[in-house]
Amino acid sequence: MKRRSFLKSLAAVPAASLALPRFAQAALPKTRITRVRIYKPPDLNPLFNQSNMLVTVETEAGITGIGEGGVKDTLEQCAGSLIGKDPFKIEAIWQEEYMAFFYPPGREKQDAMGALDLALWDIKGKALGLPIHQILSGAVRNYCECYNTGNVRPPASASGAPPTVKERVQATLDAGYKLYRMGAGDPGSGPWDVRSRLLQVARDCKAAREALGDSGDWSIDFHQRFELDDALRGCKLIEEYSPYLVEDPVRDEHFLDDIPRLRRMTSVPIAAGEEWGWRWDFNKLVENHDIDYNRCTLPNVGGITEYLKIMALCETHAVGMVPHFTGPVATAALVQCLVTYPLSVMFEYNYGNRQIPYLPQYTDFKAGKLYPNDR
């Protein structure tokens, strides 16, 4: 390129740059929020005490967004302040909801804010004709690896005996999953006997590693049932079997004190956070790398708006994302977010190929993997 042509093209850059905001703004219709509806759908996970309330946010432009989470009273309280707002000013709405009312928002309000925030991002995606991962930074992976909450149960034996760990592992691998999950903190039928439970945990973990060989991974959930000394004893017993992660090894009320202590005394990767809200619940644990995986999920943290900030915090400190299972709307949103996350991702998923009657084709699941879609 000749010098004169180069200078001429360079001079045109500011004018082109000034035009970009107008072009971007033109892609979004001028509209306001007109109505928020709240629904109680069929209970998809009756064994779990988890809200699956649905919300729809309607606009003058005829675009309706769908969200999930919260309870009726809190949703109604939060929804009223949305009426008349520009649905595309998502951060401004989030900040106003966070600061509103007399008291700091608790986890119930965070969940309700998360439901409404999901609906606002849905509106934006529909207005632009783009999936959320394209509105963000674009996908860095084609799918998210999953594990099944209760694994895949093998066919019943002729004797009626319960399946062995080896049989459960094989059924899980055959279904396409690469990670087999176990629980260490199930209450059982008698008094809580920590010593015998930890010895059984060690036997099960050894059996899982032997069954998996080098073809897969295993993890175990301590379910916050162990004090620090017992958690340490359990972690030491299973270190040699190379777990993918140990989840919630200590009691929740002691997390901020005991997880850093445990971190210094064991080599197992630690995961925590399925009950956390936004970043201030755990930022120190992430910043000090006291955990390897963050289990926080949608809509609990306050929606996609907050989840993106959590992802940035975790990426900065090399912490992977392993969100707790959630409802179908939030699951679809999580997949859209996490295909943009460049570090380790593992997805807890327990719907399998089961159809959701009120939300067909909400995501694509196949052979242990969740794929984002353009719907």
Locate predicted features.
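N-terminal secretory signal peptides
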Residues: M1-K2
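N-terminal export signals
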Residues: S5-Q25
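C-terminal segment of N-terminal export signals and the immediately downstream linker at the start
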Residues: L18-F48, V57
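Metal- or metallocofactor-binding catalytic centers and their adjacent structured scaffolds
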Residues: E58-L130
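Conserved, mostly hydrophobic/aromatic
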Residues: G62, L116, G129, D221, ...
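Shared catalytic-loop signature of beta/alpha-barrel
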Residues: Q77-C78, K85, K89-A92, K236, ...
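Glycine-rich, aromatic-flanked loop segments that form ligand/cofactor-binding clefts
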Residues: D117-P154
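Metal-dependent enolase-superfamily TIM-barrel catalytic cores that perform enediolate-based chemistry
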Residues: Y143, N148-P260
